[in-house]
Structures are given as C-alpha cells and as structure tokens.
C-alpha cells in the first residue's frame, strides 16, 4: 500500500494571540507540526505534503528534508486545502489527511485507522471520538443503521445536532483515486462560503461507495490546539505519556507532575529524577544517576552513576561517577571526567577536567584543559579574556591551585606544580615548583592606636 500524508498547516491561529504561526508553537520541545510529521513517517508514509499558508516561509524553514509543501494562499476551508495539494495525489494508494495542530495523534491510532479502512474496503474513513463537551467540533450524524449519514460543521449545526457528542477529528483515510476524483466536485454552498472536506464524504456516499467511521476511546489522541489554554492541556498530556514511557523503562520519578522532560531525551535504567528537574533536547542520561531537584540539563550527555545537585548543564559531557553541584553551572563544550567533583557555585565553560580532579566551590573555569588529580581551590578564577579574544589555561596532572588565585591566560601549570593561595599567576609554572604571585605581608605595629580606630 502506497501511503501519502497531507498535513494541513495553513491556518492563522487567531485565538493563540501570537505573531508565530500556530503550528510552530512547541509541545515538549518540538513544534506541533514536527510531532505530526514524525508520526506520519512512523506510520510508513512514503511522502509528507504540508499545506502552508499563514507564515508560510517560517513554517517551511522548520521542515525536515524531504517534506514537500504547497501554498494555500487563501484559507477557503479544509476541502480547499486538500485541493491545492491535488497534484501530489496519485490514482493509486492511500492518503492520510492530518492537522498540524494535533500533536497528540499516535502511530498506533493511525495504524488502527488504516487497518480498519483497508479491511472494510472503504473509499474513505473518518476518525471520530465521543466528548463530554463537543463544542467547537463538527458532529458525526449517523443513520438508523448506525452508519455515517453526514458530518455537520459546528457553525452549521441545528439545535438538535449540537447535542450529538460524537465528533469529527478532522483526520481521514482516503483511497487516492477516489479522493482525486471527488475534490473537483466539492462546492462552497454553506454559510461560510468555504470548501469543506467533510463534503467529500457525502459525495463519495452519494456515488454508492463505502464510507467508514472509526471511533477511538482515547479522545486525547485527537486533541487540537486553538488557544494557549489548549496548548497547555496538550503539553500536560504529552508530558504524562513521556514520563510513563520512561517509568516503564526503569526510571524513577519522585514527583512526575513537577518533572519536565522532552520527547527527545533518553534516560537509563535505575536513574532517579527529583522534583523540578528539566531535561531538554538531545540529552542522554545513563544508568544509576541521581538528578537532584531543580536541575536543568540541555543537549548534554551524562554517563553512568553521576549525581547532579540543583545545577544547570548545557551542551556538556560528563563521564562516570562524577558529582556536580549544588548550584554548579556547566556551559557549552565542557567535558567532565570520571570521579570529578564540580562543587557549589562553580562555573565551567569550554573546558576539560580530567579524571579524579576537583573544583569544590566558588570557581570560574573557562577555556581550560585540566589534567588528572588536580585540585582547584575555592575562589580560583581562570582569567581567559583580554578584551579582544579568549585564551587557554593548561594545568597538568597532580597540580594544586590554592584558594583565591587568578590564572591569567595563556598559561601552563606543569605536572605536580603548586600555586600558593592568593596568587596572580601570569607565566608558566614549572613541574614540581611552588609559584607565589602576591605581595609580601607587612604588619604595622601600633597602627590602630595611632589612628584612633577600633574602639569607641
């Protein structure tokens, strides 16, 4: 079966009150349209055609390679949207029609819809669900034999039809040839003067062909987004699904409702996520890690047995059994080795810290290469910027940098060298040497009495 997906994404999204095209609003880190494209591909669609309109250029910039677009210059209804994609509809195979603002649709639901469509030998099949409050949706009107009679748009419903709870999801499965032949027959004889895709089903029925209705129990799959409130509702549902998937794979969430984790994140078995954790982008966390409360990790790789306490980690790599935080900040291109400690209020940027080294507290480590078993004392500053460009600091294995020292780059501290506390180091420190870069202490006896300070 040759399958194509047509995704309608031309709407203005007026109720979103946004300068951004509606389908580009994100749910769990990915655009709504991106979610729908992914599910289409997972359902084995050989080709995805996105119908763009409002903000067409912005939408096109976000699309993955291979996804085609057609322009609906005027938004004249769902039928018209599919009409502008007619050149991509062939005379054999199957066409799925989806919406770019419905990010919760699943591969399982689409596969079930297509199986029902194929096994029933239907020319068209509509996906439906029953809602407690169907306001805003088109209604499924059935005949006395419980088969589809017609679909009535919300704005065209009678008082009696408004009471119907079975709604049209807007998702359809068509025989390609039948759809191609039916599109030119759709008229705009309605109060809105729009071309409704629902009319295609009526035409297909009138021509004696079979139209199926596939009703799902989980209405969440077909939730659409037309407002910020609905965006939040959809985000909540997707978060719940993501968390459930991770828990089933052996991840512990101390408080699932307060944890934010994007769809693209990977987490290993027996890792524990505490309340307030935020995991984003291409983050990968290994097994047996503990991610403490209010930690934020983006596009980073954490290996096994790592503990992170209330820290921020951006585009960095952390090797096995390192400890980070509390309140550490790892900025992009940081690589933390095995059994390394990066303690409280330590900031690391574009730096490598090799195995068993530690910076326990209150340090800035920028543009640096630090060897094994190195100690960085409290208050150490890597002075990496001269006002024009950044410079690198290299510290070799087993070196020791005392508290409150400034290392003015470019500089190298050789193996097993020591830097005395309070020093400002401006040139290389040889292996095994002690570097002292501070003025000698001078005590002025009797100074307090002479100045008359201290006592009142």
UniProtKB/Swiss-Prot annotation:
A single GO BP: lipid A biosynthetic process
Gene3D superfamilies the UniProt entry points to: Hexapeptide repeat proteins (2.160.10.10), Spore Coat Polysaccharide Biosynthesis Protein SpsA, Chain A (3.90.550.10)
Domain of life (superkingdom): Bacteria
Annotated localization: Cytoplasm
Keywords, ordered alphabetically: Acyltransferase, Cell shape, Cell wall biogenesis/degradation, Cytoplasm, Magnesium, Metal-binding, Multifunctional enzyme, Nucleotidyltransferase, Peptidoglycan synthesis, Repeat, Transferase
Residues where acetyl-CoA binds: 384-385, 403, 421, 438
Annotated binding of UDP-N-acetyl-alpha-D-glucosamine, by residue: 8-11, 22, 72, 77-78, 99-101, 138, 153, 168, 226, 331, 349, 364, 375
GO molecular function, one term: UDP-N-acetylglucosamine diphosphorylase activity
Function of the molecule: Catalyzes the last two sequential reactions in the de novo biosynthetic pathway for UDP-N-acetylglucosamine (UDP-GlcNAc). The C-terminal domain catalyzes the transfer of acetyl group from acetyl coenzyme A to glucosamine-1-phosphate (GlcN-1-P) to produce N-acetylglucosamine-1-phosphate (GlcNAc-1-P), which is converted into UDP-GlcNAc by the transfer of uridine 5-monophosphate (from uridine 5-triphosphate), a reaction catalyzed by the N-terminal domain.
Oligomer status and interactors: Homotrimer.
Protein name, per record: Bifunctional protein GlmU
Provenance organism: Alkaliphilus metalliredigens (strain QYMF)
Recorded name of the encoding gene: glmU
């Amino acid at each position: 079966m040759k399958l194509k997906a047509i995704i309608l994404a031309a709407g203005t999204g007026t109720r979103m009150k946004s300068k951004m095209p509606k389908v580009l609003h994100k749910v769990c880190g990915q655009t709504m349209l991106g979610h729908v494209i992914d599910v289409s591909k997972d359902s084995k669609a050989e080709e995805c055609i996105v119908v763009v309109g409002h903000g067409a250029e912005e939408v096109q910039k976000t699309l993955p390679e291979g996804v085609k677009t057609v322009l609906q210059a005027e938004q004249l209804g769902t039928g018209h949207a599919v009409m502008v994609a007619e050149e991509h509809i062939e005379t054999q195979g199957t066409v799925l029609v989806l919406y770019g603002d419905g990010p919760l649709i699943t591969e399982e639901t689409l596969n079930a819809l297509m199986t029902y469509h194929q096994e029933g030998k239907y020319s068209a099949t509509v996906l439906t669900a029953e809602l407690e409050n169907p306001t805003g949706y088109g209604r499924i009107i059935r005949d006395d034999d419980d088969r589809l009679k017609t679909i009535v748009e919300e704005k065209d419903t009678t008082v009696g039809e408004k009471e119907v709870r079975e709604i049209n999801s807007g998702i359809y499965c068509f025989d390609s040839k039948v759809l191609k032949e039916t599109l030119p027959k759709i008229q705009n004889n309605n109060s809105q003067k729009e071309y409704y895709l629902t009319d295609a089903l009526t035409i297909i029925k009138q021509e004696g062909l079979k139209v199926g209705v596939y009703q799902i129990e989980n209405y969440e799959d077909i939730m659409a987004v037309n407002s910020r409130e609905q965006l939040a509702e959809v985000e909540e549902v997707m978060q719940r699904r993501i968390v459930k998937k991770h828990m089933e794979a052996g991840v512990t969430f101390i408080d699932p409702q307060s944890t934010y984790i994007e769809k693209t994140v990977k987490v290993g078995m027996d890792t524990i996520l505490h309340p307030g954790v935020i995991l984003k982008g291409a983050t990968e966390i290994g097994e047996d890690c503990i991610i403490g409360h209010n930690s934020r990790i983006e596009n980073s790789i954490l290996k096994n047995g790592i503990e992170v306490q209330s820290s921020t980690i951006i585009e960095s790599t952390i090797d096995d059994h390192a400890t980070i935080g509390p309140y550490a900040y790892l900025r992009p291109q940081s690589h933390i080795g095995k059994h390394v400690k990066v303690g409280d209020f330590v900031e690391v940027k574009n730096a490598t810290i090799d195995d068993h080294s530690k910076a326990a507290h209150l340090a800035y480590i920028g543009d640096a290469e630090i060897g094994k078993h190195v100690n960085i004392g409290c208050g150490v500053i890597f002075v990496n910027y001269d006002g024009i460009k950044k410079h690198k600091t290299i510290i070799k294995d087993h070196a020791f940098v005392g508290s409150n020292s400034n290392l003015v780059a470019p500089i190298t501290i050789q193996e097993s060298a020591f830097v005395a506390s309070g020093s400002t180091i401006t040139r290389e420190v040889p292996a095994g040497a002690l570097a002292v870069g501070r003025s000698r202490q001078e005590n002025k006896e009797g100074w307090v009495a002479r100045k008359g300070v201290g006592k009142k």
